[in-house]
Amino acid sequence: MELRAIKTGKLIIFGRECDMEKKTALIIGASRGLGFALVQEYLARGWQVVATVREKSGSALHELAERSSGDLEVERLDITDTNQMLILKRRLQNRRFDLLFVNAGVANDRYETIGEVATEEFIRVMVTNALSPMRVVENFELNVVANGTIGVMSSGQGSVADNEKGGFEVYRASKAALNTLMRSFAARHSQDKRSLLLIAPGWVKTEMGGPDARYSIEESIPRVVDTITAQANTSGLQYLDQFGKVVRW
């Protein structure tokens, strides 16, 4: 068998050009908005991606997979469903990824105070934004290679130090809880050489961010991916914005 590398990053096998091994990403929560854009950006940069949505079929991600020439695989996962998470964990148990990135976020009314929010709504936001992303990290961290990256989509509103204007009280609390849980994970894995990231993408024009947000998805997500890429092979936990600047805890 003829097998040789050439400068273009290709292999010649039986006279055919083949891509050398691509980097791989597992992106959780990619049905729309920031998560979907992350998948698009990594595909555009030549990665192979496994991404999750809640739907069995018919989503924009499924349609993207059909056009991806095999570089995108779609798996089903409701991030709050522990049974689905365990099923996916078994399905992917022998897979290894350079990047695990978890994107999840819901919000209640921005002006609803902690004294007004219903208990059920408080639980919904906390479970979706804090508990469930960390359950993903706990269940899939062994799928990430030794020099890989584990990232979670946080928010600048998760910063306790920067909370000077109020508003979004429950959402802020949920992202602050996420940050604290990720920090506890990092403390338990202090000898881990992988990069651990909390990413604040900025106020982005999404369904949740609204039309008046400062940044478009097309502005934010390439910067987010640049920031993730720049931190590769940098061990320990960092809380960074889309520009790679440190966010105060």
Predicted regions and their residues:
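Conserved N-terminal Rossmann-fold NAD(P)-binding element of oxidoreductases
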Residues: 25-29
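N-terminal Rossmann NAD(P)H-binding glycine-rich loop of SDR-like oxidoreductase domains
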Residues: 31, 35-40
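Conserved glycine-rich Rossmann-like NAD(P)H-binding loop of the short-chain dehydrogenase/reductase
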Residues: 45-61
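Rossmann-fold cofactor-recognition segment
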Residues: 67-83
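Conserved Rossmann-fold cofactor-binding substructure of NAD(P)-dependent oxidoreductases
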Residues: 79-95
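Catalytic loop of short-chain dehydrogenase/reductase
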Residues: 106, 110-126, 134, 142, ...
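C-terminal helical subdomain
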Residues: 191, 198-199, 210-249
